[in-house]
From Swiss-Prot:
Its main location: membrane. Belongs to the CPA3 antiporters (TC 2.A.63) subunit E family. It comes from Staphylococcus haemolyticus (strain JCSC1435). It comes from the Bacteria. The gene is mnhE2. The lineage of its organism: Bacteria, Bacillati, Bacillota, Bacilli, Bacillales. This is Putative antiporter subunit mnhE2. It is found in: Cell membrane.
Amino acid sequence: MRQVVLNILIAFLWVLFQDEDSFQFSTFVSGFIIGLIVIYILHRFFGQAFYPKKIWIAIKFLGVYLYQLITSSISIINYILFKTRHMNPGLLTYETNLKNDWAITFLTILIIITPGSTVIRISKTTNKFFIHSIDVSEKEKESLLKSIKQYENLITEVSQ
């Protein structure tokens, strides 16, 4: 976070030092790029990774989540319109490797927001999720657990 604020500060200082009559977005962008270069050179002194890596991870995370949201929404629409009699609702468990409370909460929110599944309970001792799903057939169960594992890996990547 400090790196982002510092980069924006460098960009604004660059705009001020250019002595232009009005604010030019192109000057701000060039200052932002200069700030990126300065921060890249000095990022070892911050004790953190260079921040554009985190931005890329967040964009990748958003893309994966939007893909999962769209595909699960289409799947739920398919169940509602055509397979109402063939639904197999039930519970399944998922054991997570996440340790932070915020990471577990974030994973819970992602599972709840995804259509067709909700978290019923989280075991505090074993970090096991009890999840209700609209269909726990072998194929759907495998698909749901795969997407949850993908969320977990991305949360782990973001938190490092």
